[in-house]
Design a protein with these regions (language model features):
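Beta-strand scaffold of nucleotide-dependent catalytic cores
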Residues: 177, 292, 361-365, 436, ...
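Canonical Radical SAM [4Fe-4S] cluster-binding loop centered on the CxxxCxxC motif
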Residues: 171-206
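N-terminal [4Fe-4S]-dependent radical SAM core
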Residues: 102-105, 125-126, 130-174, 223
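Radical SAM enzyme core and accessory elements
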Residues: 1-132, 163, 424, 428-504
């Protein structure tokens, strides 16, 4: 789909308009000039009188389509923020034209970002009441009432689960990345390396990780900075041996400040084929209070197609084993839109989930991530169309509501099927604090281990900077000391006395 757009000279419009085009068309390219082979031609004009700007768009078709939007530009804002307001006004017109042309309604409006609930949190922190905040978001971004209400439900749940969410900037959370898995799934782009035959690499990696944990723990103790949550992800953290897990958790309790006061420790035991009684005993020994066991689907043919070499029965058996051994906060992940699946298969998966009733359930919508096996071979992995994916999401919403689950976090991804979202549900009181913190970007998260990203949130301005460890084990093993020291330098500046929040 080739889209010609005339009337806009600023190249900063290109990316947001391309992202909106992607909501409607699987393969689309936009051009800021007239082209001969355009499938869609749109002319946009801007007229600004003092603070008011009028954006008009005309889409050339058999019957030309026209849309108009007026907006007020706050001239006291920075040039960057003024452009943002102008960009939103242009996006309104562009979206209206494409919706009228295709007959498709985008429930998230012009929003293409990952964290829509963050916008609602911002308005509430600025003093808006919930009803006003919802109306403003709907107007500013063309969000449907249905999605605005979902955002409000999630924000309410988050603030009930973490009442001090807005004042956690003086603490940190820790993400620990363990980059090994039994096999790599077809949809995955996380740092994940088949563990078989890599014991030498595993040993070197674990040596580097222990170093990072010691050094970072020492610095946090010296500065008197508390840890809110710890999350072991990957990869599959339970791919390593029970003895190796035991040594890691001992390191956490020895090196991290006030480890017994950490509010939540999560371990992704996502692949059932990595779970053993010995590993569950280790988790129990160290009071690990939240784990994930992820079926993704209860259709065996699907698991085989996506490269998960475990059986459905193994998922059920390992879940029951974890329950018998005292694990009382288990999350499970399901994915909507996996190859070969439709509403029938997803209904079956929900029915099987009902037999287990985990404390939380994360419902993902399949996303075609650029580097995944599935994206590189789309012809091989046939997936449901937009309409069927929406029906599956509706099934998930209905099922979770009927079974007492509440939505508590939400995020979106680029190239996600049906322009939908990923939603975390839980029983009230069983929400993952880490998931809330990372999605709403309320505090610094320090990434340790291979492929782990750190997200540094400035305690006063809220400005976010990123820092990533190498994704491949060899690069990590060769340079972990350097990356540890670099993170500590950033933290030294971030948590200097000059940067302390005045309100805390």
């Amino acid at each position: 789909m080739h889209i010609s757009i005339t009337g806009l000279s600023d190249q900063r419009f290109e990316r947001p308009l391309q992202l909106i085009a992607n909501l409607f068309f699987e393969e689309s390219h936009i051009y800021f000039n007239k082209i001969d082979n355009a499938d869609i031609s749109i002319e946009i004009s801007l007229e600004q009188i003092e603070t008011e700007v009028t954006v008009t768009g005309i889409l050339d078709s058999n019957v030309p389509l026209r849309a108009e939007h007026r907006a007020v530009i706050d001239l006291e804002l920075s040039e960057k923020e003024q452009f943002k307001q102008l960009k939103n006004a242009v996006s309104h017109v562009y979206l209206m034209l494409l919706q009228e042309l295709t007959g498709m309604t985008q429930k998230w409006g012009i929003l293409t970002g990952v964290r829509p609930t963050k916008l609602l949190h911002r308005k509430l922190r600025e003093g808006a009441d919930p009803e006003t905040a919802q109306k403003e978001l709907a107007k500013e971004h063309m969000i449907t009432p249905e999605k605005a209400a979902l955002m409000q439900r999630i924000v309410d749940r988050q603030l009930a689960a973490v009442p001090d969410l807005y004042s956690l900037k003086k603490e940190v959370s820790i993400y620990i990345g363990i980059p090994f898995c039994p096999t790599k799934c077809a949809y995955c782009t996380f740092p994940a390396y088949a563990i078989n035959g890599r014991q030498g690499s595993v040993n070197s990696f674990l040596g580097g990780l222990h170093f990072e944990m010691k050094q970072m723990g020492s610095w946090l103790k010296e500065k008197g900075i508390k840890i809110t949550t710890v999350y072991f992800g990957g990869g599959t953290p339970t791919s390593i041996t029970a003895e190796e897990m035991d040594m890691l958790y001992e390191e956490m309790y020895t090196s991290f400040p006030d480890a017994t006061e950490i509010r939540e420790v999560t371990v992704e035991a996502g692949r059932p084929d990595t779970i053993t009684p010995e590993k569950l005993e280790v988790l129990k020994k160290w009071n690990i209070n939240r784990i994930s066991i992820n079926p993704q689907s209860y259709i065996q043919e699907t698991l085989k197609a996506i490269g998960r070499h475990h059986t459905v029965e193994e998922t059920v058996d390992k879940f029951k084993l974890a329950r018998e051994m005292g694990m009382d906060n288990i999350n499970m992940d399901l994915i909507i839109g996996l190859p070969g699946e439709g509403t029938k298969e997803f209904t079956y998966t929900l029915n099987e989930t009902e037999k287990l009733m985990p404390e939380s359930l994360t419902v993902h919508t399949l996303s075609f991530k650029r580097a995944s096996e599935m994206t590189k071979n789309k012809d091989k992995y046939r997936v449901a169309d937009r309409g069927e994916v929406e029906k599956m999401m509706e099934l998930a919403e209905t099922w979770t509501k009927e079974h007492g689950y509440e939505p508590y976090y939400l995020y979106r991804q680029k190239n996600i099927l049906g322009n939908l979202e990923n939603v975390g549900y839980s029983f009230p009181g069983q929400e993952s604090i880490y998931n809330i913190i990372i999605m709403e970007e309320m505090q610094t998260i320090i990434g340790l281990g291979c492929g782990a990203s750190s997200k540094f949130v400035h305690p006063v301005t809220g400005v976010i900077t990123h820092f990533a460890n190498p994704k491949d084990p060899k690069s990590y093993n060769d340079n972990f000391e350097h990356y540890t020291n670099e993170k500590i330098k950033i933290l030294e500046d971030l948590f200097s006395e000059a940067n302390e929040p005045a309100s805390i």
